[in-house]
Amino acid sequence: NIPLIPVDTLQVLCASVLSGVLPDNALLCPMLDARRMEVYTALYQQQGTQLSTISEVQSMIIDADAFAQTLAQQPVYFFGNGAAKCQSVITHPNAHFVDNVVPQAQCMGLLAEMRPNSLDVKQMAYYEPFYLKEFVAAPSHIKGLK
């Protein structure tokens, strides 16, 4: 009877950054590389030991105006494997990039412990992970085989 507790990848990335000293009003912006200049991202703010969701998970094409309104108001810390490609485009003084942030198992465990135990084992049999976009598997084509 070990429960399966779902934990959001972007929140795990945030938890990996929280050990550093951040300003109280800073927003955390984890980014997963989607393709070209697209990332999967959300905005979070630390409130005590909890993460407060400022904007929901979304797919975003990064351009010079991305996050412009938010950056005009407060500092935003960008990290994750999608942040590096955004560094040359998002140049606002309130934009801070944190290198080498990867999901850590210890952070996943901490987030799982903080999550309310609202999902019981029966419900977990029907649990489906959240994917922002539908996965479409293309048939593989091996050269020389038909």
Go through each PLM region and give its residues.
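Surface "functional belts" at beta-alpha junctions
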Residues: I2-P103, Y131, V136-A137, H141
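Acyltransferase
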Residues: V98-K146
